[in-house]
Amino acid sequence: MAPALPITLPSKMSLRSLKWSLLLLSLLSFLVMWYLSLPHYNVIERVNWMYFYEYEPIYRQDFHFTLREHSNCSHQNPFLVILVTSHPADVKARQAIRVTWGEKKSWWGYEVLTFFLLGQQAEREDKVLALSLEDEHLLYGDIIRQDFLDTYNNLTLKTIMAFRWVTEFCPNARYIMKTDTDVFINTGNLVKYLLNLNHSEKFFTGYPLIDNYSYRGFYQKTHISYQEYPFKVFPPYCSGLGYIMSRDLVPRIYEMMSHVKPIKFEDVYVGICLNLLKVDIHIPEDTNLFFLYRIHLDVCQLRRVIAAHGFSSKEIITFWQVMLRNTTCHY
């Protein structure tokens, strides 16, 4: 009979090491499962735009107009209406536009109207500011305002207001542009560009952003939550610096807006509506018509653009005055 092999029992040290190893393994497994359950692993990879659509118009906005333009646009047939988002306190910015690219009302016989889009200054609006806005409106008659709070996160409400106003009060405008107060518009170039189009229906253009990723970082201005937008990629859309559309699209987009819950970024929101309507963005052949970022443009370059973003009120006035001079450009 073979002798029995000696059995070596694990020492207390080995048992303690095994115990800690199992504990660490369990903790690691828990952390992995927790990490996999985080929202960035739940992001929907395949974009289905019907996710945003409600069959009933439950998102129709019922804010009231507290100021409207003097001119009866419904009885006019302007070639182009430019709608400029503005904050109630931005009096200098509005005035800079009134004396520069928004001053001239007719280009080669084609009527161009410019209006400013505003919300309320605060829930308890400052009475002095309210009176000054009333006076400003009495003087110029170019302010369109509703009674929602004027904040960055409510820019989408301001855009919905713009589409509603055109649909209800200015339906005969041939083209509509939405832009901001810090954008330099070469109005003459814009009118020329629109006159040279081969088609005037189902047209939407601007600075195109294709396959632009949603930002989940800490910078709040560009952050959007997973709850608000669960996709990694935004739809094709045009930057809010300035997008242009034909009049037939305005009521269609406005109607679609009543079926789509507003999100933080107004330009992306319009892009979602365009995708649901199966409207493609027209990408300009000339890539130098729209400038998204602040760049150092000289007067000759500004004569060739339609819209350039990132200008102060003082710069808009200065560049406009220089552009009007008979400067010879050799390129």
From Swiss-Prot:
Alphabetical list of InterPro entries matching this protein: Glyco_trans_31 (IPR002659)
Enzyme class per UniProt: transferase
Catalytically driven reaction(s): a globoside Gb3Cer (d18:1(4E)) + UDP-N-acetyl-alpha-D-galactosamine = a globoside Gb4Cer (d18:1(4E)) + UDP + H(+)
An example Gene Ontology biological process: lipid metabolic process
GO molecular function, one term: N-acetyl-beta-D-glucosaminide beta-(1,3)-galactosyltransferase activity
Any Pfam family: Galactosyl_T
Transmembrane segments: 21-43
Main location: Golgi
Pathway: Protein modification; protein glycosylation
Cytoplasmic compartment spans: 1-20
Record-listed E.C. numbers: 2.4.1.79
Cofactor: Mg(2+)
This protein's record includes keyword Transferase: yes
Domain of life according to the entry: Eukaryota
Glycosylation sites (chain numbering): N72, N154, N198, N212, N326
GO cellular-component term (any): Golgi membrane
Keywords: Glycoprotein, Glycosyltransferase, Golgi apparatus, Lipid metabolism, Magnesium, Membrane, Signal-anchor, Transferase, Transmembrane, Transmembrane helix
Subcellular location(s) of the protein: Golgi apparatus membrane
Topology class, membrane: Single-pass type II membrane protein
Keyword Manganese in record: no
N-terminal signal peptide: none
Lumenal-side segments: 44-331
Record's function text: Transfers N-acetylgalactosamine onto globotriaosylceramide. Plays a critical role in preimplantation stage embryonic development.
Record-stated family: Belongs to the glycosyltransferase 31 family.
Protein name: UDP-GalNAc:beta-1,3-N-acetylgalactosaminyltransferase 1
Originating species: Sus scrofa (Pig)
Lineage of origin: Eukaryota, Metazoa, Chordata, Craniata, Vertebrata
